[in-house]
Amino acid sequence: LRGDYSNEHGFFVTPRAHLKYNPNEYVHFRLSAGKGYRTNHVLAENNYLLSSSRKVDIAKNLDMEEAWNYGASVSTYIPIFGKTLNINAEYYYTDFLKQVVVDMDSNPHGVSFYNLDGRSYSHVFQVEASYPFFKGFTLTGAYRLTDAQTTYKGERMERPLTSKYKGLLTASYQTPLGIWQFDATLQLNGGGRMPSPYELGDGQLSWNRRYGSFEQLS
């Protein structure tokens, strides 16, 4: 339990609880729940929008963001061929009570910042596995699913520019003396929703309503 005082928002209490249970040396369970507060600095945190030629409209008296967060995770350590396969799965749910909404849908030529009036939440599930195939070489894979929705002017929609899923595969090799390390990473970014487009003079949309998945190798 934590208490804070802000000269702008006054006194507030932040409760949080954590629970960990290890039934044996191979499986670990964790649960967490708590409340969080956050002051949003809209221009500093969304400065990429300043180069988009959108008109910026910031409402007065923006609230401090407030949300409940719940999480659960399980970690397993499985001995295979003298080495350990580590698998970790986790799920988090965030429910916003107060939030500063970044609205790029109401006006395709502008962006509005205002207090949430409705529901806003996110579900995130991620699974990760790592295994050292031989000395110095480790292969790690991860996959994440995200469902994030916010209410924009009375309509609850998927948050724009947020990928529905992401995948990552990393191969890492370190030389015997530990002087050099080489990494190869393959990343998959799933598609998502674009901000609402507008119609051009010929009736065509200014851009697609959704963007597709893409891969990146480095």
Give the residues covered by each predicted segment.
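Outer-membrane beta-barrel translocator domains and adjoining extracellular loop/strand segments
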Residues: 9-15, 42-50, 55-57, 99-108, ...
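Short sequence motifs at beta-strands and strand-loop junctions characteristic
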Residues: 7-11, 61-66, 117-121, 161-165, ...
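Signature of Gram-negative outer-membrane beta-barrel scaffolds
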Residues: 1-27, 39-40, 50
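Hydrophobic, lipid-facing positions within transmembrane beta-strands of outer-membrane proteins
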Residues: 13-19, 58, 68-72, 123-127, ...
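Membrane-embedded beta-barrel scaffold of Gram-negative outer-membrane proteins
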Residues: 22, 30, 61-115, 119-121
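Gram-negative outer-membrane beta-barrel transporters
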Residues: 87-95, 115-198
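Transmembrane beta-strands of outer-membrane beta-barrel pores
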Residues: 1-7, 33-39, 48, 76-78, ...
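Face-selective signature of the C-terminal outer-membrane beta-barrel domain
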Residues: 1-9, 22, 83-91, 125, ...
